Amino acid sequence: MDVVQTTKPLFPDTLLHIYCLKGHPPQVSDGPGDFLGTWEEDGYSFLFFLQPRQRFVDTLLETCGELEQTDYLTMTYRQWQGDFVEPLKIGRFVLTPPWLKRVPAGDEIGLRFEPGLVFGNGTHPTTLACLTAIEIVCGGAPITRMLDLGTGSGLLALAAARLGCSRVVAVDNNMLAARTARANVIHNGLEAEILVACGHAQHFVQCSSELLVANIGFRVLAELVAEAGLSAHRWLVLSGLNQVETKALLPLLEDNQILLLKRWQSQEKWNTLLCITQFGR
């Protein structure tokens, strides 16, 4: 487990310098002071800086011969994140960027939230379904301990803490994501409630909790269910699954005496499952 520090603050007009590489470089621990982090997806890596850093990237390419630079982009943070520059209402939750102020009205739950450079601005169907499932679970008997695997920008962990979970562990294997989550924890003053860690889900799944949330994809979920059984947890919210993957996962849940309570399907693709283990019955 790595201790997670925060990312540098970003504002709508912050100019980003983005280098796209084919392949995955080693973790950059001695980059320039304006290095923001690396995001990896589908065999490509995106290195983010606040200044042009072609010389640094060239050195990285020389050191790691299997890497290839495919693009260099500049854009503002507003352009990178699209529309997320104003408060966003999702159910009872109102997500407000740190540079804006908004007082929640009525039963709204306010969260100061910055998606940073990573996936997770709150609008993806799996995120919406997970938020609904967390509200259902936390609306019953009090939930104290929550484990969030694949936390991304930390939104689900923040929501759980605001709904009463006082001991939350949020995990992501991407340091940039973990740093973003840590920054959002600080934005909301929830350092006492939420611990953010950078590591693999398999290393944390045995940490017992009343609520496990894993919006993490089929391969890891299937491995966690098959090898760990998830018996250290009571409620499970499993997401990031397409139809075929869900069909393959359901027998694994049944084999491990995990009962499916509710299933959300959106856009005829994304599935989110609310389950309870034998431990919770």
Regions inferred by a protein language model and the residue ranges of each:
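A short helix-to-beta-strand connector/capping loop
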Residues: 68, 91, 107, 166, ...
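Short glycine-/acidic-enriched loop or helix-start segments at secondary-structure transitions
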Residues: 57-59, 105, 158, 223-224, ...
